[in-house]
Amino acid sequence: MRHYEVVVLIHPDQSEQVPAMVERYTSTVKADGGQVHRFEDWGRRQLAYSINKVHKAHYVLLNVECSDAALEELTTNFRYNDAVLRSLVIREDAAITEESFILKAEKEGRERKARPARAERRDDTEAEDLSDEEGVEAEDFEEEQGV
């Protein structure tokens, strides 16, 4: 059996049915003795260009190990399902189980959005502390000069 990476773009109006569709595709793979190594639901994303006047799609990533017959059945299911806008199947040398770059970038983006608010608050308090210290230094200088 070979390893494959499968990306499926599903019509955004069918987003509620994505779990059932994924279950159907994974059962197709497992029925032939295959295995699903990784499943990622990337959610609804903007397309680079419109497909059939649709500007968004629901993205799903699967890394599977299956036979050629199971892969053929899977691609046939994609082809005849009207909800599937596009599908891409790439043959891999080994099973990939780690997080994809898109999921990692999405998590880092969420973390970055949370961090600046805290950092800005720290910068504001540091600026206030510095201005207080400068005022104290100015008073000390004036006292030394006898003003």
From Swiss-Prot:
Keywords: Ribonucleoprotein, Ribosomal protein, RNA-binding, rRNA-binding
GO molecular function terms noted in the UniProt entry: small ribosomal subunit rRNA binding; structural constituent of ribosome
Superkingdom: Bacteria
The keyword Transcription regulation belongs to this UniProt entry's keyword annotation: no
Annotated region described as Disordered, given as residue ranges: 107-147
This protein's GO CC annotations: cytosolic small ribosomal subunit
CDD domains documented for this protein: bS6
Function: Binds together with bS18 to 16S ribosomal RNA.
Entries under HAMAP family matching the protein: Ribosomal_bS6
Family named by the database record: Belongs to the bacterial ribosomal protein bS6 family.
Name of protein: Small ribosomal subunit protein bS6
Species of the source: Cellvibrio japonicus (strain Ueda107) (Pseudomonas fluorescens subsp. cellulosa)
